[in-house]
Amino acid sequence: MKIGILGGTFDPIHYGHLWFAEYAREKFKLDKVFFIPNRVPSHREIPIATSKQRYEMVLLATLNNPYFEVLPIELEREGVSYMVDTIRDLSTYFSNAELYLLLGNDAFRDFLKWKDPYKIVEKVSIIVGSRGEEYYTNDLKDFIKTFENKIFFLDFPYYPISAKEIRDRVKKGLSIKYLVPENVEEYIIKNSVYCEEDQKDVK
């Protein structure tokens, strides 16, 4: 069994996330892709939407894809969400599966700053959503060379959108149609997500 792992704040989840996951699933013949929302991200700002809201939006977004599944394991874990802990748990539970960590190129550039990156790559292969020629530090280039049999670059048609742009558009009362799935758009509007700056909450 081949399992893809896509972590993130998903604040909110959008078509860029979904397209990357589906493209990687198809190219690498993954049997399942797990979406794993962070509780408290280690290298990003605290999310604006609550953990419950972000989890529910990811559930809605992945509802109609039988290959996608949402795991709340980081939301249920207290404190900062570290991928090394998540990978340890998944590799134990799915001991016979091949695990593939899906990373956007921005996240991959910071990968060596993550907690225990070498422990992560011991247990998973990495699929990097590359947007063409990128500029990496020498340390990252050495890392790529060392683990060249476990790091794959996926040249996929990039969906030019960011979660911040979506939040800003919501705050300004602008349309987010075609940026997020329709049921996620309805959820954001119905629950007034991203309308208030002081909404930050990790619960």
UniProtKB/Swiss-Prot annotation:
<keyword id="KW-0808">Transferase</keyword>
<dbReference type="GO" id="GO:0004515">
    <property type="term" value="F:nicotinate-nucleotide adenylyltransferase activity"/>
</dbReference>
<dbReference type="InterPro" id="IPR005248">
    <property type="entry name" value="NadD/NMNAT"/>
</dbReference>
<keyword id="KW-0067">ATP-binding</keyword>
<keyword id="KW-0520">NAD</keyword>
<dbReference type="GO" id="GO:0000309">
    <property type="term" value="F:nicotinamide-nucleotide adenylyltransferase activity"/>
</dbReference>
<dbReference type="Pfam" id="PF01467">
    <property type="entry name" value="CTP_transf_like"/>
</dbReference>
<comment type="pathway">
    <text>Cofactor biosynthesis; NAD(+) biosynthesis; deamido-NAD(+) from nicotinate D-ribonucleotide: step 1/1.</text>
</comment>
<keyword id="KW-0662">Pyridine nucleotide biosynthesis</keyword>
<keyword id="KW-0548">Nucleotidyltransferase</keyword>
<dbReference type="GO" id="GO:0009435">
    <property type="term" value="P:NAD biosynthetic process"/>
</dbReference>
<dbReference type="InterPro" id="IPR004821">
    <property type="entry name" value="Cyt_trans-like"/>
</dbReference>
<protein>
    <recommendedName>
        <fullName>Probable nicotinate-nucleotide adenylyltransferase</fullName>
        <ecNumber>2.7.7.18</ecNumber>
    </recommendedName>
</protein>
<keyword id="KW-0547">Nucleotide-binding</keyword>
<comment type="similarity">
    <text>Belongs to the NadD family.</text>
</comment>
<comment type="function">
    <text>Catalyzes the reversible adenylation of nicotinate mononucleotide (NaMN) to nicotinic acid adenine dinucleotide (NaAD).</text>
</comment>
<dbReference type="InterPro" id="IPR014729">
    <property type="entry name" value="Rossmann-like_a/b/a_fold"/>
</dbReference>
<dbReference type="GO" id="GO:0005524">
    <property type="term" value="F:ATP binding"/>
</dbReference>
